């Protein structure tokens, strides 16, 4: 099935060199989903001692799950596009009011992860509550991506 929703945004990301075409690869998508699940399992082990690390792992789980959708379609982010291109592509195709709401958390999660990785002197410390919310949001993203990949409706983006 050709996924029409978000097509204009994907084409713009391709034209801007933020995404590139690759061979669609469901095995690669599954590997990314498995890695995302492993990250979430690790979150349960570290959140008590390292809230910032747990938040970062949660974000990485969500990002890998989002990338799994693109891998299934034969798309991958370039160095230029990076995490933002993955977020933009997935939200355009699968998120928003007409899609799966889990993907709407990606932008906030990316910004929180960035603040945790590169804190300023006045940046608040990541709390256990922050880490728990990130884990909840990441689980929703991973589950939504898993359902979409398993649906068999993702084909090469042409």
Question: Where do the PLM segments sit?
Answer:
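Terminal alpha-helical segments
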Residues: 1-158
């Amino acid at each position: 099935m050709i996924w029409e929703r978000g097509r204009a945004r994907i084409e713009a990301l391709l034209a801007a060199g933020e995404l590139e075409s690759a061979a669609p690869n469901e095995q690669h998508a599954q590997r990314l989903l498995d890695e995302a699940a492993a990250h979430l399992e690790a979150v349960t082990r570290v959140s008590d001692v390292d809230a910032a690390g747990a938040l970062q792992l949660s974000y990485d789980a969500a990002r890998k799950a989002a990338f799994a959708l693109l891998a299934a379609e034969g798309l991958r982010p370039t160095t230029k596009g990076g995490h933002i291109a993955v977020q933009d592509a997935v939200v355009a195709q699968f998120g928003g009011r007409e899609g799966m709401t889990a993907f709407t958390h990606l932008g906030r999660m990316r910004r929180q992860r960035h603040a945790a990785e590169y804190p300023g002197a006045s940046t608040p410390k990541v709390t256990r509550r922050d880490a728990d919310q990130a884990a909840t949001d990441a689980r929703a993203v991973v589950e939504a991506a898993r359902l979409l990949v398993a649906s068999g409706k993702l084909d090469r983006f042409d």
